[in-house]
């Protein structure tokens, strides 16, 4: 079905060949994903010929046994992959003048190798925007996987909360989360590097976990996600370890109110900028606008950051079936940071989150 869309696009745009280079996009079109490391793993589609998946011999049998029911062409390490690709293309079609390439995943070295095989071809057409657009709208089968990934994120939060104790390092908490995800849920891949930030470290939104230790009476920020059958989760919660100060409670409640207001306001037909503005106004009116230093959200699907960008100034119209995050944050340098994030799907009835961990301020007991 997805590959039919690609072939139709080639025909409508006068293109002969599509060169798909990102493993994630190949998975979207074929149902097969692997990590080829430094080897060549590509999908070739044509306006009027059968597509083929090109992969290392190491992955050939796996690809043949996958959901992909088209041709698979493997190559040995002793072979030149680019000359073999050219041979396969010329077997299938005489039309290879006009190429559409996924520029987001095309390296200079690979472009040069292709151009050497097809010196008279035009590689200037970019597939990236088309791919981003068709991936915007999730099918029900995709939503099932996104919801499952959300359930895994909810489980991970509970493990992380339980792991907090006096003197434990941020990295040790991350290790416990990821170990229990593997042990109890069979999760073999997180969607990004798990973030646990305690105290003033939480004021640096994307700082990785450190050897900083958790201390009583501070906020701890968790940002985590998993991959479930090729689909990502991404969620954030902030908790108090021990009794928070009044200022900590204040910034938490302002942020929670802003996030819930944006969730309640989200509907088809509004722009991404308008949705960002809902949360941003609440935080600004409370006096913390300068500490909300990023966009409200981002799309999610097979990758943890996709289109659309829920950002001030982005006038893309939100539509039913789009999946994205709503994640306002307040980060006060040298003091603390708060972020609350849910990813979900926009329906005719509003925004439906994939994660359900409570957003009331959780005050965890101090443990030795």
Swiss-Prot record:
Residues that bind Mn(2+) 2: 223, 234, 341
GO cellular component: cytoplasm
Enzyme Commission number(s) of this protein: 3.4.13.9
Molecular function GO terms recorded: metal ion binding; metallopeptidase activity; proline dipeptidase activity
Keywords carried by this UniProt record: Cytoplasm, Dipeptidase, Hydrolase, Manganese, Metal-binding, Metalloprotease, Protease
Chemical reaction(s) catalysed: Xaa-L-Pro dipeptide + H2O = an L-alpha-amino acid + L-proline
GO BP annotation list: proteolysis
Principal subcellular localization: cytoplasm
Pfam family, one: Creatinase_N
CDD domains for this protein: APP-like
Major enzyme class: hydrolase
Alphabetized InterPro entries for the sequence: Creatin/AminoP/Spt16_N, Creatinase/aminopeptidase-like, Creatinase_N, Pept_M24, Peptidase_M24B, Peptidase_M24B_aminopep-P_CS
Keyword Cell membrane tagged: no
Binding site for Mn(2+) 1: 234, 298, 327, 341
Cofactor: Mn(2+)
Alphabetized PANTHER family for the sequence: AMINOPEPTIDASE (PTHR46112), DIPEPTIDASE YKVY-RELATED (PTHR46112:SF10)
Name the record gives this protein: Xaa-Pro dipeptidase
Provenance organism: Lactobacillus delbrueckii subsp. lactis
Lineage: Bacteria, Bacillati, Bacillota, Bacilli, Lactobacillales
Gene name, Swiss-Prot/TrEMBL: pepQ
């Amino acid at each position: 079905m997805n590959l039919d869309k690609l072939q139709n696009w080639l025909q409508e745009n006068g293109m002969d060949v599509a060169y798909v280079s990102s493993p994630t996009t190949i998975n979207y079109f074929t149902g097969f994903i692997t990590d080829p490391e430094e080897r060549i793993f590509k999908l070739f589609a044509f306006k009027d010929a059968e597509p083929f998946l090109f992969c290392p011999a190491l992955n050939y049998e796996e690809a043949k046994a996958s959901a992909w029911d088209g041709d698979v062409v493997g190559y040995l390490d002793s072979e030149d992959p680019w000359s073999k690709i050219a041979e396969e293309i010329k077997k299938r079609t005489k039309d290879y003048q006009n190429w559409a390439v996924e520029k987001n995943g095309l390296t200079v070295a690979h472009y040069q190798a292709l151009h050497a095989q097809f010196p008279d071809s035009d590689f200037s057409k970019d597939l990236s925007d088309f791919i981003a657009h068709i991936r915007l709208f999730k099918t029900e089968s995709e939503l099932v996987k996104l919801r499952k990934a959300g359930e895994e994120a909810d489980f991970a939060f509970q493990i992380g909360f339980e792991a907090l104790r006096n003197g434990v390092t941020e990295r040790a908490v991350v290790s416990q989360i990821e170990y229990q995800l593997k042990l109890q849920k069979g999760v073999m891949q997180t969607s990004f590097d798990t973030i646990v930030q305690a105290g003033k470290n939480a004021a640096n939104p994307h700082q990785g976990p450190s050897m900083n230790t958790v201390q009583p009476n501070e906020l701890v920020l968790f940002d985590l996600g998993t991959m479930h059958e090729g689909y990502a989760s991404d969620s954030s919660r902030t908790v108090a370890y021990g009794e928070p100060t009044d200022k900590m409670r204040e910034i938490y409640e302002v942020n929670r109110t802003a996030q819930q207001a944006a969730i309640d306001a989200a509907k088809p037909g509004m722009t991404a900028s308008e949705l960002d503005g809902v949360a941003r106004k609440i935080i600004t009116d409370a006096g913390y606008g300068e500490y909300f230093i990023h966009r409200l959200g981002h799309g999610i699907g097979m990758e943890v950051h996709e289109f659309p960008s829920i950002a001030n100034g982005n006038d893309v119209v939100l539509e039913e079936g789009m999946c994205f995050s709503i994640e306002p944050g307040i980060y006060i340098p040298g003091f603390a940071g708060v972020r609350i994030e849910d990813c979900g799907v926009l329906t005719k009835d509003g925004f439906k989150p994939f994660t359900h961990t409570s957003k009331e301020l959780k005050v965890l007991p101090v443990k030795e």
